[in-house]
């Protein structure tokens, strides 16, 4: 499909730079294809679902994945650079998006932290620095880094020297601060590894989760470590030419059994966020049976995709021409979503990671 079919005009003022406070005070646009749009609030979610339905949450935890450092090369001068970690390949290796990538080459050494350590680092770190070697340089500014530390020692160093990776549409307008450390993390986050938040989950407060439990709605956790590729624009003119970056997901046997039981009793599986949806779809057979899953997924969902696992979706409002707007258009229909987004813009809904939410129901085949 042509990528320009997924384009729309979005006023700069619609981009949220801070979340609603409290979390569950966000607005919720309910989208049922063929029906009138409904303006509700996130707090209404328990009343919009049925007892026995299951909300599926992505419990990944955002790590401080933005590292600043100095490139060192034999016979050359130091060059400041930045690496945004996005996919762990081994205990000592991460793929990252680098700036300026054109100044880096295989064999270069980078010292992160130390003198001139990161602006906005997550905490004071006792390390003098963290060293890595550039092993590969790929397309789109991607590099492969081999660190001198590995495993938990590397995790600790990144936690101390790294900075929170706010999306560019926020970070380009204001500095990261202490509020973001809490705001850009779900209240149920528990598995470190994401470099971007599963933002639909940011709306859920402890009080709202209690309300979900009281309504008899099941809560199920899966893990997909969101990568920085989620921020990358689609540069191709046609969706067929776009390559998704892989992300690591885990859905264990017990969770698969719980999800299959939801469907068996006639209830619905409701994904909280596109990341949960992508993992569920990756783990589900064509007949709708959910299987255990552990590994990488690069599933790219566009209109024409036949959904296997998910009956409804809670998600934020996404960027024009993005893979996420393509996904929601596949779920509820492109015309439906273009109309819903036009309504949201006209009605003052707030967009992107810190913005408002929508509850989407699927477009049914005629």
UniProtKB/Swiss-Prot annotation:
CC per GO annotation: cytoplasm
Subcellular location: Cytoplasm
Gene3D superfamilies: QueA-like
GO term, biological process aspect, one: tRNA wobble guanine modification
Role, per record: Transfers and isomerizes the ribose moiety from AdoMet to the 7-aminomethyl group of 7-deazaguanine (preQ1-tRNA) to give epoxyqueuosine (oQ-tRNA).
Subunit architecture: Monomer.
Top-level EC class: transferase
Protein name as annotated: S-adenosylmethionine:tRNA ribosyltransferase-isomerase
Superkingdom in the source lineage: Bacteria
Recorded family membership: Belongs to the QueA family.
Catalytic reactions on record: 7-aminomethyl-7-carbaguanosine(34) in tRNA + S-adenosyl-L-methionine = epoxyqueuosine(34) in tRNA + adenine + L-methionine + 2 H(+)
Organism: Methylorubrum populi (strain ATCC BAA-705 / NCIMB 13946 / BJ001)
Matches recorded under InterPro entries: QueA (IPR003699), QueA_dom1 (IPR042118), QueA_dom2 (IPR042119), QueA_sf (IPR036100)
A molecular function GO annotation: S-adenosylmethionine:tRNA ribosyltransferase-isomerase activity
Covalent S-S links between cysteines: none
Pathway(s) where this gene product acts: tRNA modification; tRNA-queuosine biosynthesis
EC assignment: 2.4.99.17
Alphabetical keyword list: Cytoplasm, Queuosine biosynthesis, S-adenosyl-L-methionine, Transferase
SUPFAM superfamilies: QueA-like
């Amino acid at each position: 499909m042509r990528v320009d079919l997924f384009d729309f005009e979005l006023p700069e003022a619609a981009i949220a730079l801070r979340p609603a406070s409290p979390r569950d005070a966000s607005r919720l646009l309910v989208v049922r294809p063929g029906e009138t749009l409904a303006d509700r609030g996130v707090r209404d979610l328990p009343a919009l679902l049925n007892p026995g339905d299951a909300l599926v949450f992505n419990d990944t935890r955002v790590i401080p994945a933005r590292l600043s450092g100095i490139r060192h090369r034999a016979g050359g001068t130091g060059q400041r650079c930045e690496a945004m970690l996005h996919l762990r390949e081994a205990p000592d290796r991460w793929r990252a998006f680098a700036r300026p990538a054109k100044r880096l080459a295989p064999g270069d050494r980078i010292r992160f932290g130390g003198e001139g350590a990161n602006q906005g680092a997550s905490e004071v770190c006792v390390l003098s620095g963290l060293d890595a070697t550039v092993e590969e340089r790929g397309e789109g500014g991607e590099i492969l880094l081999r660190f001198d530390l590995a495993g938990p020692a590397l995790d600790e160093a990144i936690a101390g020297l790294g900075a929170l990776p706010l999306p560019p549409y926020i970070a380009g307008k204001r500095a990261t601060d202490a509020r973001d450390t809490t705001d850009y993390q779900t209240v149920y986050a528990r598995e470190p590894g994401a470099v971007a938040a599963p933002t639909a989950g940011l709306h859920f407060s402890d009080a709202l989760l209690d309300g979900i439990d009281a309504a008899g709605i099941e809560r199920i956790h899966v893990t997909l470590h969101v990568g920085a590729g989620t921020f990358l624009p689609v540069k191709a003119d046609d969706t067929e030419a776009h390559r998704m970056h892989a992300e690591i997901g885990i859905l264990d046997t017990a969770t698969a059994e719980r999800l299959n039981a939801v469907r068996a009793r006639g209830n619905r599986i409701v994904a909280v966020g596109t990341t949960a949806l992508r993992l569920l779809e990756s783990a589900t057979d064509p007949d709708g049976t959910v299987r255990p899953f552990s590994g990488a997924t690069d599933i790219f969902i566009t209109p024409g995709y036949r959904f296997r696992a998910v009956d409804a979706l809670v998600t934020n409002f996404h960027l024009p021409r993005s893979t996420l707007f393509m996904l929601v258009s596949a779920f509820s229909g492109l015309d439906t979503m273009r109309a819903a987004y036009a309504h949201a813009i006209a009605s003052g809904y707030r967009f992107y990671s810190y913005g408002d939410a929508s509850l989407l129901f699927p477009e049914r085949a005629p």
